[in-house]
A protein has these predicted regions:
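N-terminal periplasmic "start-of-domain" segments of outer-membrane beta-barrel proteins
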Residues: 119-125, 131, 135-171, 196-198, ...
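N-terminal periplasmic accessory domains that precede
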Residues: 176-179, 198-203, 216, 237-240, ...
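Short acidic/polar hinge/loop motifs at secondary-structure boundaries
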Residues: 218-244
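Transmembrane beta-barrel wall of Gram-negative outer-membrane proteins
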Residues: 270-272, 277-308, 312, 316-354, ...
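Solvent-exposed loop segments that connect transmembrane elements
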Residues: 313-319, 357-373, 418-425, 468-532, ...
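Membrane-embedded beta-barrel scaffold of Gram-negative outer-membrane proteins
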Residues: 390-415, 625-629, 642, 648-733, ...
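Gram-negative outer-membrane beta-barrel transporters
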Residues: 443, 453, 457-459, 554-558, ...
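C-terminal beta-signal and adjacent terminal beta-strands/loops
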Residues: 463, 476, 634, 755, ...
Length: 904
């Protein structure tokens, strides 16, 4: 009888554990929900690992130990209850049951799936209609060091999207531009060059100067916006967080944050060789090696080459307008000398050389865009180095993390700024940037009702920009022609007056005077004009922050955060406009110079308090939750170096006639410099974000649904517009106020025993100006114009993304599995100007891929824009020619290729 009772007790415990396994997505949630930190930030792998063949291998020993430790923490915690301890024990039981299920899957079904980053665990079905499909959050499987966060993303009061290596490969996404189409309310258009890194989230974005979205790579903040548009390779995971993240990530994360994680050598072993070729001679090669010397040391080395011939051709030169070549290498060395201490050294170098800025004339009436036709083909070259040393120490009750980084960027850009075959003006820009950052964070790891994170951030950036602007005959010839006419008429008139004073009739005097001047060689003039300039703009930033998560009940958690951020921006400018007027007057040649030099400096300091308040309510044992958040966003102010050529050219035009008397240098007083400094400055942008959302785990964990609705109020919104009087170059202005509201929805699921995987997302953003008055030149006079009620430019109202793939496993032969997939994306409409006069209508793109796994080799066929949809990724207006004209860059046509990946 006693044995029967004991057996029944064991049976009941097993049934209870099975129920818990069905209800909860993973053991990590069971531990977290009862107040235990499942991921302490120092463990690189705490989730389920899937081998290359798709057979799941649970890291059971580590999970059991972690779950046991978690149980001990719960029991010993001052606020812990018996219920919490039981939940933690059940989590450990669940791990063991997962192991058993996975062994059965391997033994009985030979389950074949995807790689380690599939966000899922495969297990056998029972019965004809049984479906064991389950999806998991990627940060349960691809676990990286998180120095700041206390919870996984879908347990925080925020809206986010995560994609793993498998998803990146299926979408053939090699940078953020290609990835953004599958993230709701997020867009990074593909145009210009690698220098171009415009990103827009929820109506907030930036094309120049300070970014509105931040980027972290392996825990290191990328400082220079010109480095944002980088090539992905050996990426393990990408997280996109939407909404202000300033409380713990600081300024310039007003729209959101992108976190990129690369593969680490403790979790990945062996050598990867990737080769690819595609349409228009797209070519790619990658080689990576991961070596784990022991449980204490590991090393990875990786390198890549990527190139293409492009699809646009400059009709003026007859040469390609968007071909590119880039290459890079990465070193990562990780140490874990003790169970408490860790070190991670990263060095990442990338080189880019490409043609760029292939903008053709755009007709807003029918949306047609011509091939580019410029006399100066645009180009861009960049050398970029990102290095970081990350240190971690785990003590009793807390963790301490330090991230120190050094970043170098050196680039060289050439742009035809009139975008026509006539030589009006062109710009060269060379940047040299050095940056140092240091971030210290400490966070609690003990169980209880209060979890906290505190930290400090410090950065200093040296930036030197050499940006001369050259004006061609399209600008200088009208000036010299006007001066030539004035000089000629003046000489003829003076000579005729002397003849008339002697009694000669006026008509005869004028005719003889003209003949005399012409006989003596006449008057001819030409002008050369350029605006060289060197600008030094160092920036200093310091921030201190704290965030607390307080468990008000066993299901309700309050998040309270505050950051103080101080930013100082300096500018020291040494620039001048030089116009050389070459004249020949009646056989006498002379060169007169008109110059205007500006050599001065100024600075601005900005400080902000960035609060955040959130509530998260867990609704069931599977981890579903609803949340509400109020947070403040902030983008720092600064200076427009792009405006100097316009300012100086205006001064030259006003003083051009003085060259007739000799060389002339335009004087400047302190009052003049004060006006210049005020003209080039723009103010910080601030916003308040109000958000409601939900993270739901449905149908026994086979479907994840994320919902969010938000409302944002923006003050002093920063906009990139054409500079000043002549419309040369871009500058940043403050557009008064705007508001943005919208919804976001994302679904991700698995079916047919995890053979079918799918995801879909939708974002609607309605961003409009509520107070923005500018001036417009009408008949030579400036008149005020209001853009109130107009949509914010460059922001798509709708973003849609969907992808699905189906895997067919094989238990015999060299072929292990075949996978087919489709993806779909759409966005629009997008207005290109503040007046909403021209736009891109909503458009859709279709992609597909087919993959086959043959031993250690995977062969993939892929295609993009299979319907060959015609659309524009960017458009602008320019008045460089004297009249306003529109230019745009075409989106990529149908493309495709084949990839071969070998792992050994």
């Amino acid at each position: 009888m006693c044995n029967f009772a004991a057996d029944m007790k064991k049976t009941n415990e097993t049934i209870a554990a099975l129920l818990l396994m069905a209800l909860a997505p993973n053991a990590a949630f069971a531990a977290t929900n009862c107040g235990v930190t499942g991921n302490n930030g120092m463990e690189e792998i705490t989730g389920t690992k899937v081998t290359e063949k798709g057979i799941t291998e649970s890291m059971v020993a580590e999970k059991v130990v972690n779950a046991s430790k978690a149980s001990e923490k719960v029991v010993t915690a001052s606020k812990a209850s018996e219920k919490e301890a039981a939940a933690s024990k059940a989590a450990a039981n669940k791990v063991s049951l997962n192991k058993t299920a996975e062994k059965n899957a391997f033994k009985n079904n030979k389950v074949i799936g995807a790689k380690a980053k599939d966000n899922r665990i495969t297990s056998p079905g029972n019965g004809l209609f049984a479906d064991s499909s389950r999806v998991f959050d990627i940060d349960e499987v691809v676990v990286a060091v998180q120095p700041k966060e206390q919870y996984r993303l879908r347990m925080q009061p925020l809206s986010s999207t995560s994609l793993g290596a498998r998803q990146l490969t299926s979408l053939h996404a090699t940078d953020l531009r290609q990835l953004s189409a599958f993230v709701p309310s997020f867009v990074m258009p593909e145009y210009g060059s690698r220098y171009t890194s415009a990103m827009y989230v929820r109506g907030i974005g930036s094309r120049i100067n300070n970014p509105a979205v931040g980027i972290y790579v392996d825990g290191m903040p990328v400082i220079n916006k010109a480095a944002f548009n980088m090539h992905f390779y050996q990426a393990d995971r990408v997280d996109v967080l939407r909404g202000p993240q300033g409380t713990i990530y600081g300024q310039n994360t007003e729209g959101g944050l992108v976190k990129i994680y690369t593969k680490d050598p403790f979790s990945h072993q062996g050598t990867d060789l990737h080769l690819g070729i595609g349409t228009r001679l797209w070519r790619n090669a990658e080689l990576a090696h991961y070596a784990k010397f022991s449980d204490r040391a590991a090393l990875s080395l990786a390198a890549f080459y990527n190139g293409q011939n492009g699809f646009l051709r400059n009709t003026f030169t007859g040469k390609r307008a968007d071909n590119s070549d880039e290459a890079g290498a990465r070193l990562r060395f990780m140490l874990r000398p003790t169970s408490r201490f860790s070190a991670d050294l990263i060095a990442d170098y990338q080189f880019t050389r490409q043609k760029g800025f292939a903008y053709g004339q755009f007709n807003p009436a029918d949306g047609a865009t011509e091939q580019p036709s410029t006399n100066y083909p645009g180009s861009y070259k960049r050398n970029m180095l990102l290095t970081a040393l990350k240190l971690g120490y785990r003590a009793e009750g807390f963790e301490l993390h330090s991230t120190t980084s050094y970043q170098l960027l050196r680039d060289d850009m050439l742009m035809d700024q009139d975008y026509t075959s006539t030589d009006y003006m062109h710009l060269t820009q060379r940047q040299l940037q050095n940056a140092l950052t240091e971030e210290l964070t400490v966070k609690s790891t003990t169980a209880g009702i209060w979890r906290w994170t505190s930290g400090a951030f410090l950065s200093y950036q040296w930036l030197k920009t050499d940006a001369p602007v050259f004006f061609g005959p399209g600008i200088t010839q009208p000036i010299s022609t006007a001066l030539q006419r004035i000089t000629y008429n003046g000489i003829v008139s003076a000579m005729a007056q002397r003849m008339m004073a002697q009694g000669m009739p006026q008509e005869v005097a004028m005719t003889r005077a003209q003949a005399a001047v012409d006989a003596a060689g006449g008057v001819s003039m030409s002008a050369d004009m350029k605006v060289p300039g060197v600008f030094r703009t160092p920036q200093f930033n310091v921030g201190v922050f704290h965030e607390s998560n307080v468990h008000l009940t066993d299901r309700l958690t309050a998040t309270l955060g505050l950051r103080y951020d101080l930013n100082r921006v300096d500018i020291n400018y040494d620039t001048k406009a030089i116009m050389a007027l070459n004249s020949t007057v009646m056989g006498t040649a002379a060169t007169r110079l008109v110059t205007s030099a500006l050599n001065h400096g100024t600075h601005k300091a900005y400080n902000q308090l960035l609060p955040k308040v959130g509530l998260t309510l867990t609704t069931d044992e599977s981890g579903s939750n609803v949340y509400a958040t109020v947070s403040k966003g902030y983008r720092s102010g600064g200076f427009n170096i792009q405006m100097f050529s316009d300012i100086l050219q205006t001064e030259l035009m006003a003083n051009a006639r003085r060259a007739q008397q000799g060389d002339y240098d335009v004087p400047h007083t302190e009052a003049d410099y004060d006006r210049v400094n005020k003209t080039i400055a723009y103010k910080p942008e601030t916003s308040w974000n109000y958000e409601l959302g939900a993270h739901l785990n449905l149908f026994s964990g086979s479907v994840h649904l994320d919902l969010a609705a938000y409302y944002m109020q923006v003050r002093n919104q920063q906009l990139s517009v054409m500079a000043g009087t002549y419309g040369f170059g871009r500058m940043m202005v403050n557009a008064g106020k705007s508001r943005s509201c919208g919804i976001e929805a994302a679904l991700r699921g698995s079916a047919l025993n995890n053979r079918l995987e799918w995801r879909a997302s939708y974002g609607m953003t309605h961003a409009t100006f509520t107070d923005y008055t500018d001036s417009l030149k009408v008949n030579g006079l400036y008149e005020p114009i209001s853009y109130k009620g107009k949509r914010v430019p460059f922001v798509p109202m709708h973003t849609v993304g969907a992808a699905a793939s189906y895997t067919v496993p094989f238990s015999k032969g060299i072929c292990q599995w075949v996978r087919f997939g489709l993806d779909f994306s759409a966005q629009g409409s997008i207005y290109w100007d503040e007046a909403n006069q021209y736009k891109q209508k909503m458009y859709a793109l279709l992609g597909a891929h087919a993959d086959v796994k043959l031993g250690v080799t995977t062969v993939s066929l892929w295609g993009r824009n299979l319907t060959d949809t015609r659309y524009n990724t960017f458009a602008l207006s320019s008045a460089a020619t004297g009249s306003t004209r529109c230019f745009a860059q075409r989106g990529c046509p149908v493309t495709g290729g084949v990839d071969v990946k070998i792992h050994f």
